[in-house]
Swiss-Prot record:
Keywords: Detoxification, Flavoprotein, FMN, NADP, Oxidoreductase
Keyword Metal-binding: no
Co-factor requirement: FMN
HAMAP family in UniProt: NamA
Enzyme Commission number(s) of this protein: 1.6.99.1
Phylogenetic lineage: Bacteria, Bacillati, Bacillota, Bacilli, Bacillales
Subunit structure: Homotetramer.
GO molecular function, one term: NADP binding
Protein name: NADPH dehydrogenase
Catalytic activity: A + NADPH + H(+) = AH2 + NADP(+)
Gene name tied to this protein: namA
């Protein structure tokens, strides 16, 4: 059997294969209330039907002010739980495990009214200037991640991912470009890591399942985070109880990274080796052979697929065929699953 289609354990959760649907914002909550819609059900469940092992839902805001846009999913109140519970049931029906990415946009929120950040520095000249979070407000953010994690548990999710990448709030705290604080949340790396550590520990108070953290392994900017900065971060995350790091890049500043097949895989490889923690690799991974090479050469433990799964919900089926594997079809589709 290929490694791509071998089982993988995240704590006590067993994935049927190592293909993960990357969290990708769909901006499709038309009522602006954070509640998942029929679109979300069809979108995510179709990828589970296609054979994906773990489906991670898009950035789901823990505070209303933490949305990237008004059209984002949310878990800041109990009314948002039932629709997600139904969606999780659909994922489980097709044998996929269900993950959710808990997030706060910070200064990258595009919303009416006040937005917040670790320091009062706008994303760019076209963006609103955020208000610097007080220590009390930071503690409330941490508490809201905990509350959202509890709601995720109530909805039946198997995995929680904490979004600490792509220039959103936690990433803003981690990077010296966006964190100019002079208190115990700013300055040295250990201080800048504090909010993420506090969030992980708070989530663990109500959640005993696996925790993944998504990071941006480089800011692609002078004075920003580089790969070597993430080795100690990853070691601290491991000590705090994180199971796996989902390794992306960029998003903190408005710069286009160099993009080519597998362009982010070396970052996952280096963090895996440098910190001794499991990683997920992503970045233009589009074929089964490519994914298999990454796993067999121990460059990562999971394959996180984004845009290819938008193009092709049956990526797992096609990857299996490329690797000479056969995977079980949904019974409703078995007559055509060749």
């Amino acid at each position: 059997m290929s490694k791509l289609f071998s089982e993988y354990k995240l704590k006590d959760v067993t994935l049927k294969n190592r293909i993960v649907m990357s969290p990708m914002c769909m901006y499709s909550v038309e009522n602006k209330d954070g509640i998942a819609t029929d679109f979300h059900f069809a979108h995510y469940v179709s990828r589970a039907a296609g054979g994906t092992g773990l489906v991670i839902l898009e950035a789901t805001a823990v505070q209303e002010v933490g949305r990237i846009s008004e059209f984002d999913l949310g878990l800041w109140n109990d009314e948002q739980v039932p629709a997600l519970k139904k969606l999780v049931g659909g994922l489980h029906y097709h044998g996929a495990k269900a993950g959710i990415q808990l997030a706060h946009a910070g200064r990258k929120a595009v919303l009416p009214g006040e937005i917040v950040a670790p320091s009062a520095i706008a994303f760019d000249e076209k963006s609103d200037k955020p208000v610097e979070l007080t220590k009390e407000a930071i503690k409330e953010v941490v508490a809201d991640f905990k509350r959202a994690a509890y709601r995720a548990k109530e909805a039946g999710f198997d995995v929680i991912e904490i979004h600490a990448a792509h220039g959103y709030l936690i990433h803003q705290f981690l990077s010296p470009i966006t964190n100019r604080r002079e208190d115990n949340y700013g300055g040295p790396a250990g201080n800048r890591y504090k909010i993420l550590s506090d969030i992980i520990k708070a989530v663990k108070e109500v959640w005993d399942g696996p925790i993944i953290v998504r990071v941006s392994a480089t800011d692609y900017a002078h004075g920003g985070l580089q790969l070597e900065d993430h080795i100690p971060f990853a070691k601290w995350m491991k000590a705090d109880g994180v199971e796996l790091i989902d390794v992306s890049t960029g998003g903190l500043v408005n710069v286009a990274p160099p993009v080519f097949p597998g362009y982010q895989v070396p970052f996952a490889d280096e963090i895996r080796r440098g910190a001794g923690i499991a990683t997920g690799a992503l970045g233009l991974i589009t074929r089964g052979e490519q994914a298999e090479e990454i796993l067999c050469n121990e460059r990562a433990d999971l394959i996180i697929v984004g845009r290819e799964l938008l193009r092709n919900p049956y990526f797992a089926k096609d990857a299996a065929k490329q690797l000479g594997e056969t995977i079980e079809a949904p019974k409703q589709y078995s007559r055509a699953w060749k």
